[in-house]
Amino acid sequence: VEFVTARAPDISVSCGFLEHMLRILTFHGQLDLKIHAYGDTEVDCHHLVEDVGICFGQALREALGDKRGIARYGSLAPMDDALSMVVVDLSGRPYLHFNVPMPCAKAGDFDTELVEEFMRALANHGQLTLHIDLLHGSNTHHIIESVFKSLALALRQAVARDTNVDADTDAGTGANAGSGGKSSGRTARQIPSTKGVL
């Protein structure tokens, strides 16, 4: 994974619906994603979807590096009748909240419950916090597409450069904390958090 805008993604997955969603994710998130994945889809897509989520999460975590200078937080995206909200925090703390009722158990040949499995694998192995809610929608395909669009936009916002991230804060952090208040600036690998420095 690279955060660029000009390259076409290199995606080949033996689950057509998942490949479609990954292409939506890379387009709207402006990600350069290379992924080739094949599995026992003659049984079902469960293992493949979960493994792709794991690999994408790990690649995302590595691409973010120390996360210094990024906005960190990221969105709403419609697809016709469907409107989804995805809020991401590149915090280093894996968590998934997934509230997306699916009207149908299948979208074509794709088991719709696997969307949650993909997101859980992404959150756990990307070490990020994800809150995903469907605000409204009736078409299952549109609902899933709006979720992936929202995820793409949330990631795009969260990885954007933010010059304010390097600014001093009112409270000391990391090695500077407890040093008599002489310095309140963040050091190079520090990410501010309500639970301390990440």
Language-model regions: role of each:
Residues V1-G174, G178-L198:
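Structural preference for solvent-exposed beta-strand-turn elements
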